[in-house]
Amino acid sequence: MKIELAIIFIVLAAGAGFLIGNLLRKKLSDSLVSKAEELASRIVEDAKREAETISKEAALQAKDVVYQAKADFEREAKEKHKDLQTLEKRLQQKEENLDKKMNLFDQRDADLTKKEQGILAREQSLNRKEESLDALVAEQRAKLEQISGMSSAEAKKILMDAMESEAKLDAAKRIKAIEEEARETADKKSKEIISLAVQRYAGEYVAEKTVSVVALPSDEMKGRIIGREGRNIRALEAATGIDLIIDDTPEAVILSGFNPVRREVAKIALEKLITDGRIHPGRIEEVVAKAEEEVEQAVKEAGDQAAFDLGVHGIHPEILKLIGRLKYRTSYSQNVYQHSLEVAFLCGIMASELGINVKQAKRAGLLHDLGKAVDHEVEGSHAVIGAELARKYGESPKIVHAIMAHHEDEKPNSILAVLVQAADALSGARPGARREMMETYVKRLEDLERISCSFGGVNNSFAIQAGREIRVMVSSEEVSDERAVLLAKDIAKKIEAEMTYPGQIKVNVIRETRAIEYAR
């Protein structure tokens, strides 16, 4: 490229010089023309020399490029050759390794073939020996049968019987040892669990009484409570079934009755009447009805509170109401509501120690005495009644079984049922929890009411005066005055036949006729 430029440059310079010479020749004198020609000649010479220099430099640069390209090519060729040699060596090594492995495999194959032949030969030898031994055993067995007079089957049976007897004896000894060890361990563990449960829960309890005291603002209120010819006190006793004892006790009226629900109703009603000041039979019936509603509300709240305290949920509202009614029930003077809570807590503690469902254990403990909330009109033990109620209101079969089995009405077949039994015994049998005399007294009063209500035409009955009198309220439409006399005798005879009691019991049959009309 530089050579071409040099040639072009020379041509242009020559042309320029020629033109300049012509111009100078025409315009200048001959001297000037000659000088111009000399100048042009020098310019041409300079251009030639420069062109030669450029040409030489270009040739040298071309040689350098060719040399560098050749050197690069030779270097790359050497590197590729080296890589090929390395790859060739690697392939050669792999080939040698494969040859060695093939030789090793061939040797192993030969060894295996040799061993297989040896095993076959040994197997044939063993088969021959086995046949020989079988023949020898058969020969010896025949000789033994001939000498002993027993067949091989008989001898085998005798041997098996002896071994079986020995095995049974060993197994029986082992089982007995295991049972004793398990019994000792279980007894120790159960004592630990029960003692821990008793230590962790210590419920407070005050023995129930059969009387309530209502404070009066003054002794003058006693006369108003009695009313003209005693009509107010009779109306209150008839409406509540509770004895009102008005004696010399200053500014107080004593309510006596074994049924805590009725006694609570009577107490609330009397307090309202005293506060209101209007005391007459019509007002008494109205206030008693309101008091019964308040007690029912208190019953519902007590059931809800029990479930909340224990952390058990999903209990049917009717069951919660029955649990609340247990607050007004006693068993050997022990409040059944508090007893149920105590059993539930004890069940939960023992269940946590045993690693079973704590919520389920608390639920079973809370509901175990549910049947005691039902009045005596329903026949059956409280365990059976409670189980039926639990089943009716959707409790699980495990809970139903635990309720049914806690007094052995059904054999307990689950850990939960046994836990409820244990917790029930812990709560009831601890010192000071119950009093036998109180329960016997209440049972006698309940039997009096049960016997009285078993006759037709009886609306209600109330055992009063500490069980020395039973008031029987009859329907005026079903029982006439003459029939009332006979009914009193029949009730008295049945009480004499079925009950044992000190002194005598007064049977008072009350037949009331009401005529109601409205003035408009």
Swiss-Prot record:
One protein family per Pfam: RNase_Y_N
Chain ranges passing through the membrane: 3-23
Record's subcellular location: Cell membrane
Keyword Oxidoreductase set for record: no
Residue span, KH domain: 210-273
GO molecular function: RNA binding; RNA endonuclease activity
GO cellular component: plasma membrane
EC assignment: 3.1.-.-
GO biological process: mRNA catabolic process
Keywords: Cell membrane, Endonuclease, Hydrolase, Membrane, Nuclease, RNA-binding, Transmembrane, Transmembrane helix
Membrane topology: Single-pass membrane protein
Function recorded in the entry: Endoribonuclease that initiates mRNA decay.
Family: Belongs to the RNase Y family.
Protein name stated in the entry: Ribonuclease Y
Organism: Geobacter sulfurreducens (strain ATCC 51573 / DSM 12127 / PCA)
Protein encoded by which gene: rny
